[in-house]
Amino acid sequence: MEPVQKLQIPYKSIRLSDGTEYQSYHTEGALSGKQPADYKNGIPAFRKEWIQKRFNHSNHSQMYFAKKGIITEEMRYAAFRENMEPEFVRSEIACGRAILPSNRNHPELEPMVIGKNFLVKINANIGNSTFSSSIEEEVEKLHWAIKWGADTVMDLSTGKNIHETREWILRNSPVPIGTVPIYQALEKVKGKTENLNIQIFLETLEEQAEQGVDYFTIHAGVLLRYIPLTTNRITGIVSRGGSILAKWCQAHHKENFLYTHFDEILKVMKKYGVSISLGDGLRPGSIADANDKAQFSELETLGELTQLAWKEDIQVMIEGPGHVPMNLIKENVDLQTKICQEAPFYTLGPIVTDIAPGYDHITSAIGAAMIGWYGTAMLCYVTPKEHLGLPNKEDVKQGVIAYKIAAHAADLAKGHPGAIDRDNLLSKARFEFRWEDQFSLSLDPETAKTFHDEMLPQDRMKTAHFCSMCGPHFCSMNLTQELRKFAQEKEIQES
């Protein structure tokens, strides 16, 4: 087996004051806390040689190679990142239970795997709008999201310079990049939904695949007969892609062209090795609409489309809600697992209550932790700006951190190997009042240190056996240490 050192697996090494060294899963890769001086320089083409060796194959999907029993360099790399055997990664991809998004034209990518038997991953959405954001700002948001731990990033740009924005995001990204191609297709017809057609869509798909997009959200499950099922919903159709296609279906009174031409879409996927993320265009946008007939009818169609994609050796993940109260979350996972035969589930939250605009990174992280525990493979983050506006850098950070917490909580609940190690190290540092180690082991060391130092900024307080909450006389952990010391001196044994 190829050694980790040769593969240069991107771990973040945290060295503690007691000599312990902890290596955490790391998404920055070659960026490692920095970014190129000029985004137009991009980052190194990490996979270039690997891709060239397979360039003459007709299918570039990792599933294609996995089904042939071939362990690709990408599978080996992802396996080392997960501390798992490469053969296990290959077998999970071959049966469709995991995907490894990796377009042949995104050589900068550092491979990772998405599946319920691996670490729960998180996605961050970036992208401009008609109102704001430059290319440079979006590349900066990309680096910022990756810095805080985003495993994949989706470019959802709907404003100016969509093609160029996406190009520089890809050339600067060590993580998989996803898009929703229908957005750019709509821009090509100047926002007139009725003018969309399969030719324009396939042209857009080819353009984005040629650039190197690793996975596409395709809303092929929004069928004409499902649209009336949304009539009595409080919030109707809340997916942008879903609403675009529903409007097209009604305008022409024809079936969704993404559904009727799904085989042509798969040909593009196969050519470039793009993974498909089957979009939930009829997901619930409010608690009242959760788990309704419209949502689950579409899910049945997504199960059908999954089988069609797998026949062509195309990797598939299934997108999910949305807005779901806690008591209905498990049903979503159980049904998706059954209908889509364990294809990875990729959910937006879900948000568990609708009463907290400005805090939906919290309302959704609650649902995300639960649905991750039940088996969801990747969680799409929600920022504090959800339902209110375009997120800025700080919103992106808050969303990513909230979802890193949710994903890790899910890994702990699932008993994922090694998930508890960091918790144990931090708990030990906390009990021993090793403040600097606590900061280093935190998901957000900067914030942890800032909060501690607000009232106790002096260096000597970094070894103090108390914080500003309890002071020197009321700290329970300090008192416990004194109790243990007393018991040891008196040779008092635990009965």
Curated annotation (Swiss-Prot):
GO terms for cellular component: cytosol. One of its GO terms (molecular function) is 4 iron, 4 sulfur cluster binding. Binds 1 [4Fe-4S] cluster per subunit. The cluster is coordinated with 3 cysteines and an exchangeable S-adenosyl-L-methionine. It comes from the Bacteria. Substrate binds at residues 125, 154, 183, 219, 239-241, 280-283, 319, 346. Zn(2+) binds at residues 323, 387. Pfam families: ThiC_Rad_SAM (PF01964). Transmembrane segments: none annotated. Its cofactor is [4Fe-4S] cluster. Keywords: 4Fe-4S, Iron, Iron-sulfur, Lyase, Metal-binding, S-adenosyl-L-methionine, Thiamine biosynthesis, Zinc. InterPro entries: ThiC, ThiC/Bza_core_dom, ThiC/BzaA/B. GO terms for biological process: thiamine biosynthetic process; thiamine diphosphate biosynthetic process. It catalyses: 5-amino-1-(5-phospho-beta-D-ribosyl)imidazole + S-adenosyl-L-methionine = 4-amino-2-methyl-5-(phosphooxymethyl)pyrimidine + CO + 5'-deoxyadenosine + formate + L-methionine + 3 H(+). Its EC number is 4.1.99.17. [4Fe-4S] cluster binds at residues 467, 470, 475. Pathway: Cofactor biosynthesis; thiamine diphosphate biosynthesis. Catalyzes the synthesis of the hydroxymethylpyrimidine phosphate (HMP-P) moiety of thiamine from aminoimidazole ribotide (AIR) in a radical S-adenosyl-L-methionine (SAM)-dependent reaction. Belongs to the ThiC family. This is Phosphomethylpyrimidine synthase.
